[in-house]
């Protein structure tokens, strides 16, 4: 056959490698930085860029009205992510021609010109600490004009957090604000008093503490710009209610910044569905396949289909199926490898259930380069599983399934001809459940990023839970170093 006419085969390891190393996002980042920075020597620029310790660093903007807790959240955020905390006041402390020029405007109580303002931001963000570790901009920008200036300069955040609270709460917070002169940490006489008595004794009332009238004016000015800022950053913005304990506020902020933004990178679903008998794997796999056009592969049905086609592999499988014995893992893997290597699975993705049954089979699947990017465990109790299956029966005339509790037969005539599956007897189910649970703990350890779904719900509710974790990217996991330091 002419090589040009051969069917296209994309090795599965190519796709897995690209996803594992986030190649598509890397290329996008390289092109974006090239277009923004416009270096004279693009090749050397790319080499230097790729030699950095961390290409994908945090880029976060934290906005909110006065007294909303921006400083506290920003400092905690930087402790967790190792990013650099930046305020405009900190930028002005740098000794440079630009900062001295900006300070002269402040001394005259004049606004800093936009060109000078953006140069100051660019100068700070281009320093090695920000380049290597990322940054958190607190209260920058303050207006839509400033936000647009940042965009024109190529300063685009991955996440924007806007804190909100009622004005009454903010005014009360402002009046009770206290500062630790040693660390600069912000406390409050009512809402956030330090646990350490030593810290409490040295707290000071801020020299910039605003009277109620001035605070009200600042809030009004903030609100006039807030709506425009929301529109500017709508695609990466999260609004968080700041009128709650600061621990809860920070938890929500951290959860948001650990959630990657939607990526335009190609995404081919490779899904494993685990669950005990009666959990609804077949139904959920069917729903996923129907909605997203991916290939539904039930291992048991696939083996039956191969055994019926009178091929050499079918002749190997048939004796095991006829004697109701488990087909050896090596044979199952050969069948699955052939099926998962076809173009429809490579191009559209797949949802597999019924395999692997244990960690040894999971390792074989992994070594064959068919690594899933989503793993779900459907969870129900043994009592629910037995109730769902032991009370099911099929009408041999119509093929319709009935359940004595949830879907009783329409009349005595249908009731009389119903047939129960011998494998759904309580004794058989208990044996299958025992076998499933004996392997589950090790399988869960083998797939630490697996998602657990409560399957004791309406099937469409279960599907919505699956879907929410299927279409979105999985949250980032902080490194051990970052976790230990906090």
Curated annotation (Swiss-Prot):
Q: Which residues cross the membrane?
A: none
Keyword ATP-binding: yes or no? yes
Q: Which residues bind ATP 2?
A: 278-283, 392
Q: Which SUPFAM superfamilies does its entry note?
A: Dimerization-anchoring domain of cAMP-dependent PK regulatory subunit (SSF47391), Microbial and mitochondrial ADK, insert 'zinc finger' domain (SSF57774), P-loop containing nucleoside triphosphate hydrolases (SSF52540)
Which residues lie within the region annotated LID 2? Answer: 391-424
Tell me the segments the record calls region Adenylate kinase 1: 58-258
Keyword entries, A-Z: ATP-binding, Cytoplasm, Kinase, Nucleotide-binding, Transferase
Enzyme class comes to: transferase
Binding-site residues, ATP 1: 67-72
Q: Name one GO molecular function term.
A: nucleoside diphosphate kinase activity
Whether Metal-binding counts among this entry's keywords is no
EC numbers: 2.7.4.3, 2.7.4.6
Which segments carry the region annotation NMP 2? 298-327
Major localisation: cytoplasm
Q: Which reaction does it catalyse?
A: AMP + ATP = 2 ADP; a 2'-deoxyribonucleoside 5'-diphosphate + ATP = a 2'-deoxyribonucleoside 5'-triphosphate + ADP; a ribonucleoside 5'-diphosphate + ATP = a ribonucleoside 5'-triphosphate + ADP
Residues the record lists as binding AMP 2 = 325-327, 354-357, 432
Recorded hits in InterPro entries, A to Z, give: Adenylat/UMP-CMP_kin, ADK_active_lid_dom_sf, P-loop_NTPase
Cellular component (GO) terms are: cytoplasm; cytosol
PANTHER family recorded: NUCLEOTIDE KINASE (PTHR23359)
This molecule's function is given as:
Nucleoside monophosphate (NMP) kinase that catalyzes the reversible transfer of the terminal phosphate group between nucleoside triphosphates and monophosphates. Has highest activity toward AMP, and weaker activity toward dAMP, CMP and dCMP. Also displays broad nucleoside diphosphate kinase activity.
Q: Could you say which protein family the record assigns here?
A: Belongs to the adenylate kinase family.
Protein known as: Adenylate kinase 8
Species: Danio rerio
Q: What is the lineage of its organism?
A: Eukaryota, Metazoa, Chordata, Craniata, Vertebrata
